Amino acid sequence: MKRDKKEQIVQDVAEKIDRSQGIYLTEFQGLSVAKMAELRNEFRKAGVEYRVVKNTLIKKALRDLSSADRLASGLKSTTAVAFGYDDPLAPAKIIRKFSKTNEALKFKMASIDGVVYDADSLPALSEMLSKTENIGRAAGLINGVVSSVPMVVNAVARNLVSVLDQIAKQKQ
């Protein structure tokens, strides 16, 4: 590969890293072409880009990242990078699900918002709720509280009327 082409790839990968909320390194050695296409399709559906890049080019693209040294330690063997643009946890869910049926796919490590996670972190990352899911749950909780306030106020007023009615009956 010519130097110009390599520089273009490094620049392209560096730009993708800057845009990504989550960067995942995987090993895919032994994965068939059909399985790799299936995996890429799953990533595409989730808005995740999956790209095979030479380790030396990834190291150069990671230069400006604060977690570059820790991520560079995972650059051994064949490496493909998953870029999570909108949901930083989407790649973890796909990698975990796919690797259950395809042992050739191995999770190496990830960087989410500058925090590096090793291979043992995949189960925890894949089970975390996304930002959207957390916002939805919080909105549901708030809605539940807001809708129960009028019922509580009505119950207090109803009980007060009942007590006053009983007091009035006792005085008669």
Curated annotation (Swiss-Prot):
Gene3D superfamilies: 3.30.70.1730, 6.10.250.290
One GO term of the biological process aspect: translation
Keyword NADP: no
Gene Ontology CC terms, in alphabetical order: large ribosomal subunit
Keywords of the record: Ribonucleoprotein, Ribosomal protein, RNA-binding, rRNA-binding
One Pfam family named in its UniProt record: Ribosomal_L10
HAMAP family: Ribosomal_uL10
Oligomer status and interactors: Part of the ribosomal stalk of the 50S ribosomal subunit. The N-terminus interacts with L11 and the large rRNA to form the base of the stalk. The C-terminus forms an elongated spine to which L12 dimers bind in a sequential fashion forming a multimeric L10(L12)X complex.
Entry's family note: Belongs to the universal ribosomal protein uL10 family.
Protein name (record): Large ribosomal subunit protein uL10
Native source species: Chlorobium phaeobacteroides (strain DSM 266 / SMG 266 / 2430)
